[in-house]
């Protein structure tokens, strides 16, 4: 279980700052894939009509987890940076701190 606080004081690369400032932490989420990207247009054109599946469908998935990517936004200049963490099964943002002698809860 990885628990990350919602704010973090870290270095800001923005032109205004270039020093340690408070950052707001959120988890990165991939955007919706565009229908008009060149690869998608080519794929849709190839798929249309008769002939079934034209490209291989990937089945041999090897990984069970994804790396967690944090999005850090500077409170002062609003510059955004990304920071990747190690792989983990359980990720929590701004959860309660651990107490000594407590049982683990998921």
Curated annotation (Swiss-Prot):
<protein>
    <recommendedName>
        <fullName>Large ribosomal subunit protein eL42</fullName>
    </recommendedName>
</protein>
<keyword id="KW-0046">Antibiotic resistance</keyword>
<keyword id="KW-0687">Ribonucleoprotein</keyword>
<dbReference type="GO" id="GO:0005840">
    <property type="term" value="C:ribosome"/>
</dbReference>
<dbReference type="InterPro" id="IPR053708">
    <property type="entry name" value="Ribosomal_LSU_eL42"/>
</dbReference>
<keyword id="KW-0689">Ribosomal protein</keyword>
<dbReference type="GO" id="GO:0046898">
    <property type="term" value="P:response to cycloheximide"/>
</dbReference>
<dbReference type="InterPro" id="IPR011332">
    <property type="entry name" value="Ribosomal_zn-bd"/>
</dbReference>
<dbReference type="InterPro" id="IPR000552">
    <property type="entry name" value="Ribosomal_eL44"/>
</dbReference>
<dbReference type="GO" id="GO:0003735">
    <property type="term" value="F:structural constituent of ribosome"/>
</dbReference>
<comment type="similarity">
    <text>Belongs to the eukaryotic ribosomal protein eL42 family.</text>
</comment>
<dbReference type="GO" id="GO:0046677">
    <property type="term" value="P:response to antibiotic"/>
</dbReference>
<dbReference type="GO" id="GO:1990904">
    <property type="term" value="C:ribonucleoprotein complex"/>
</dbReference>
<keyword id="KW-0196">Cycloheximide resistance</keyword>
<dbReference type="Pfam" id="PF00935">
    <property type="entry name" value="Ribosomal_L44"/>
</dbReference>
<dbReference type="GO" id="GO:0006412">
    <property type="term" value="P:translation"/>
</dbReference>
């Amino acid at each position: 279980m990885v628990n990350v606080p919602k704010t973090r004081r870290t270095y800001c690369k923005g032109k205004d700052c270039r020093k340690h400032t408070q950052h707001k932490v959120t988890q990165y989420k991939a955007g919706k894939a565009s229908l008009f990207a060149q690869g998608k247009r080519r794929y849709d054109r190839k798929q249309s009509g008769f002939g079934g599946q034209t490209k291989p469908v990937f089945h041999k998935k090897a990984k069970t987890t994804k790396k967690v990517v944090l999005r850090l936004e500077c409170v002062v200049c609003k510059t955004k940076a990304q920071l990747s963490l190690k792989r983990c099964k359980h990720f929590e943002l701004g959860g309660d701190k651990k107490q000594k002698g407590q049982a683990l809860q998921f």
